[in-house]
Amino acid sequence: MNGFRRILVCGAALLSFGCANMRKENTWQGAVIQHARQLGYRNWIVIAEASFPAQSRPGVRQVMAPVEVPEALDYVLRVLEQTEDVRPQIHVTRELRSVENDFAPGIDDLRKRMKSALHGHDTTELDQQSLLTLLEDANRSYDVLVIRTQSALPYSSIFLELKPGYWDELSESRLRERIDRERAQKLVRPFP
């Protein structure tokens, strides 16, 4: 009976240790789901490399992810693709294209993995400083989610600007043109 009790205690300890590790590994993913559900138009998600500066402004939520940028990007895009509320406009740093593998070993592999993790989404390139300025401006009025990864390669952060999922730029442009035409027609009505 004593041996059975030891086996039972050891089994329970191993099971709880295994479950604790599973919870620990999934914590960042749960946080991403929770925060992403609260974000909408004009909010931002940054999938950041390890040295990305900590943000202290209200409205910035930070999540530590024990993965590399491509894995976090893949996960975030899968979460966003499950909603019709928002779609990401994806910005990458212009500098990333020019960083050489000789100076940052692993950058070529990271770029390949990032391309795969993009799920076919188009990207826009901007200088990192311009992206940080856009992020700072957005954070004055809107929330930002920063997912800090373990990637230790320069200029590898990805910036997702959230747009309405059910309304695109073409629809907005057509609406504005129609409103402008209606306004112009009201201004040129004949005098009775």
Each language-model region and where it sits:
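Bacterial N-terminal signal peptides
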Residues: 9-16
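Conserved mixed alpha/beta catalytic, RNA-binding, or beta-rich assembly cores of soluble enzyme
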Residues: 40-81, 168, 173-176, 181-191
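N-terminal basic/disordered segments at the start of proteins
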Residues: 26-41, 151, 161
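Metallocofactor- and cofactor-centric catalytic cores in central/energy metabolism, strongly enriched
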Residues: 22-23, 62
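Bacterial N-terminal signal peptides that target proteins for export
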Residues: 1-8
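Glycine-rich, aromatic-bearing surface loops/beta-hairpins
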Residues: 103-192
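Ordered, amphipathic secondary-structure segments that act as subunit-interaction surfaces
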Residues: 83-114
